[in-house]
Amino acid sequence: MLSLRGGSIAVAASAALAIGVVTVALVPAPQTVAASPVAVVTALGNGRETSLSTASADPGSIAAISLPAELSSAEVNTVAQMSRAQLAGQRVIYGYPGLTPPARLLRLIRRGEVGGVIFFSANYASRSQFTQAVHQLEKANASKTNPARGYPLLLMTDQEGGEVRRLPGAPTLSEKKIGAIKPLSAAETAASKAGSGAAANLRSYGLNADLAPVLDVYRHAGDFDDRYQRSYSTRPTVVSALGAKFVRAMQNGNVAATVKHFPGLGAASSKQNTDVAPVTINLSAGTLKNRDEYPYKAAIAAGVKLVMVSWAVYPHLGSKRPAGLSSAIVQGQLRNRLGYQGLTMTDAIGAGALRAYGSTANRTLLAAKAGMDLILGSDSVAQGAQALGGLENAYHTGTLNRAAFRTVVTQILALRHSLPA
């Protein structure tokens, strides 16, 4: 969703990541999948199962693999060494105010209790300052006390294009401007250029994940998404084609893409913002499936690594809860109907839309129960730590299935392994 932070537009990360489950019997040693033109792996977990192929992707890019190029039991072994707090921390994305990573965040990273960090415009003053901050995080992650030290942190931001960019540089065109280009083939070229440009830009800053592209199909001029030109088009076929091009180009550039906000916020009016208050999208199930969810089919086929789920309520999809707290939507729609096998990610856990759902720890528990893999604690390190506490307690008590929990962490590590440090 969209919020203001540090005097600039800040889109709260709303992405849902979920990649299947690695079993110990992945690939017999020696694992040399990268040398094979086609690698097929069965991924299991949280009710998802898929065969993953690398046949059509660019060699050497993260798009070429849905799991690490060298498949082994390394992630499984790493997970087996983790404490409850470390397991919980791998599922939390932290944010922090200001220009310097707080000492508490660095301590948590050194202890192996952080999965990633999100950056906003308020974290940026200059290239040298920002890259120094990234270096501090990377140095902490390399600590010998961190069992996940061999796995790069998920370092992400919202670099959508146009007005919604946290860092200077590409992509300069907004989604709406790209969607207005004629013919469609030219717009597809522009979307690919935006994806590859964003990837190169983020990599130059040391980041490896982007909370983009937006796949919402907006309805009217001035709507929530259209206000900042965050939607490609009112036509789902156009959003589908351009979003998939962006995803492929970005991931060929070794940056994980995140499509959002499933199952769609395109019908939200200019006054409807889940960051601020509850939002209900009163569309029929048929409209949501055939229009709003439509672009996700192509993104999934393109191998998108992450999906962010909306905090809006969609009563005609069988739930009175926000989508990210609803197994009917996360499991029923995204996984079972559309066949998504990747990682899921929440929007900001501190969103106003969740006011009725209690503490950060309780919201986190409800999201995890619904099938959300990564929790976005973007407001502060304290908020991220509260999310960690909720997950740790649920693991300890068995409120969340421990085997499934470890499987999610294994898949998070698999994604991190596939990304450049």
List the predicted regions and their residue ranges.
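Hydrophobic faces of well-ordered beta-strands that scaffold small-molecule active sites
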Residues: G89-Y96, V114-F119, L153-Q159, A209-P213, ...
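Second-shell loop/turn segments in exported
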Residues: I62-I65, Y94-L99, F119-S126, K177-K193, ...
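Second-shell residues forming the walls of enzyme active-site clefts
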Residues: R104, Q129-A142, N146, V238-H396
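Mid-to-C-terminal alpha-helical segments outside catalytic/metal-binding sites
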Residues: G390-N393, T399-A421
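Active-site beta-loop-alpha junctions enriched in small/polar residues
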Residues: P97-L99, A122, E160-G162, V214-D216, ...
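Short acidic, glycine-rich surface-loop motifs adjacent to enzyme active sites
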Residues: L108-R127, L211, A221, I300-K320
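N-terminal hydrophobic targeting/anchoring segments and the immediately downstream early-domain regions
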Residues: L2-R166
